[in-house]
From Swiss-Prot:
Pfam families attached to this UniProt entry: ABC_tran (PF00005), TOBE_2 (PF08402)
List of residues binding ATP: G42, P43, S44, G45, C46, G47, K48, T49
Protein source organism: Bacteroides fragilis (strain YCH46)
Gene: potA
Protein name: Spermidine/putrescine import ATP-binding protein PotA
Phylogenetic placement of the source organism: Bacteria, Pseudomonadati, Bacteroidota, Bacteroidia, Bacteroidales
Record's keyword terms, sorted: ATP-binding, Cell inner membrane, Cell membrane, Membrane, Nucleotide-binding, Translocase, Transport
Length: 461
């Protein structure tokens, strides 16, 4: 890659976006190289579309700055930025035919008629719609309308093309066809693509670089292979493809314990007996009739044919493993599992308990999360002191009836850890509460939150 290609065309530096008291983006920093195909990936509400709209100029950053080609454009209106945007809903003009839709921006610039005709025909050729220039847009299929929207965007020869979930409205086959066309188009045009999606497969297929977002923050930036093979945390591991994610303990370098069993691994630099997250992809587990080679033995709980492989759930020592393999084992079969050291991925835990800022009210009461909680008797700390409050994940109780809780919240993220669920609950105090539970909840569930006195640990600041 030469110096020109490696130069950043988009620089997002410490950008935040607030909507009232809600933080949509939290100090985001991102550099996009010229000519890259970058995909911003994340679940609904993670901030990916907000970031795209800030780059496009449809919204203004609350903090930080944005540069394109070295020029600061944070406050620059959209029509003065060297970018064009393709939307999910296409935004074509129904009263104009295909040619006039594509030519619209060029006519606004008062370009000569011959120049417009040349550019429009080149754009139509690029998207494979040479014979459609005089068709009404309402007569086109969804895929054809999307091609027209892309042609209208590229005809202006922008430095950056922004695409906001442009394939979401298409059926599966058309979406896959358009993915390949977009990839070829990017290669031919040589301009920078910034693509927003919640579809992990789409991101892995299209991108040079993937930016994974959650809760207004960037979690990881890397190539599709790096993101898939070396996720930085349990959120990324769970969001990108299927994963077995379990609690483990790093005994020492290259030796980890999980599922009540010790395994050799290749990871180093963790502290002895440090709690860690262990990630194993389903395709990296070997399954076979029980033999001495088995590291774990278990019983097949379910088996589903997926076309290119079987997907099986195996219960070992009370932990469920998802396994993908070409060999089929019947439900109820006793099997062995084996995983090679380099297929065990070790990640430092982001946290080992809930930690909150609080205030000691008296010997047996502490205030945090906007509530007054009863706690075990506290000694050596004066009433009224600012304190740190620790609550174990398994010490938080969730209830169906919100009124039964000391406070309320909404389930935002669910991670299965083999023998329990690890939930992220956004409290109405706008702080996350992390919960380990065997109960089954759904994203978006409203819950009451209770913490028993013996589950609260008060620590002097």
């Amino acid at each position: 890659m030469n110096m020109q290609e490696s130069k950043s065309i988009i620089e997002v530096n410490g950008v935040s976006k607030f909507f009232g008291e809600k933080t949509a983006l939290d100090h985001v920093t991102l550099n996009v190289k010229k000519g890259e195909f970058v995909t911003i990936l994340g679940p609904s509400g993670c901030g990916k579309t907000t970031l795209l709209r800030l780059i496009a100029g449809f919204q203004t950053a609350s903090e930080g700055e944005i540069k394109i080609s070295g020029k600061e454009i944070t406050q620059t209106p959209p029509h003065k930025r060297p970018v064009n945007t393709v939307f999910q809903k296409y935004a074509l003009f129904p009263h104009l035919n295909v040619y006039d839709n594509i030519a619209f921006g060029l006519k606004l610039k008062k370009m000569p008629k011959q120049t417009i005709e040349k550019k429009v025909k080149a754009a139509l050729k690029m998207v494979g719609m040479t014979d459609y220039e005089y068709r009404d847009v309402d007569s086109l299929s969804g895929g054809q309308q999307q091609r027209v929207a892309i042609a209208r965007a590229i005809v202006n020869e922008p430095e950056v093309l922004l695409l906001d979930e442009p394939l979401a409205a298409l059926d599966l086959k058309m979406r896959k066809d358009m993915q390949m066309e977009l990839k070829e188009m990017h290669k031919s045009l040589g301009i920078t693509f910034v693509y927003v999606t919640h579809d992990q497969e789409e991101a892995l297929t299209l991108s040079d670089t993937i930016v994974v977002m959650s809760e207004g923050r960037i979690q990881q930036i890397g190539t599709p292979i790096d993101i898939y093979n070396e996720p930085i945390n349990s959120f990324v591991a769970d969001f990108i493809g299927e994963s077995n994610i379990l609690n483990g303990v790093m005994i020492h370098d290259k030796l980890v314990r999980f599922c009540n069993t010790e395994f050799e691994c290749v990871d180093e630099g963790f502290g002895e007996n440090m709690p860690v997250d262990v990630v194993i992809r389903p395709e990296d587990l070997y399954i076979f009739p029980v033999s001495e080679a088995a590291q774990l033995t278990g019983v097949v709980q379910s088996s589903v044919f997926k076309g290119v492989h079987y997907e099986m759930t195996v219960l070992c020592n009370g932990y469920e493993f998802l396994v993908q393999d070409y060999h089929h084992f019947e439900v109820g079969a006793l099997v062995g599992l084996l995983v090679k050291p380099f297929d065990i991925h070790i990640m430092k835990k982001e946290r080992v308990c809930n930690t909150f800022e609080g205030k000691l009210i008296d010997e047996t009461h502490v205030e945090f999360l906007g509530c007054n909680f009863e706690c075990a008797p506290v000694t050596g700390i004066e009433a009224g002191s600012e304190v740190k409050v620790e609550v174990g994940f398994d010490n938080v109780i969730l209830q169906d009836n919100e009124e039964d809780g000391a406070l309320t919240g909404e389930v935002k993220f669910i991670l299965y850890k083999g023998d329990h669920y690890h939930l992220t609950v956004l409290s109405d105090w706008d702080e996350n509460v992390f919960v380990d539970t065997n109960d089954v909840w759904d994203d978006g569930d409203r819950v009451g939150i209770t913490i028993p006195p013996d589950g609260i640990r008060v620590i002097k600041n």
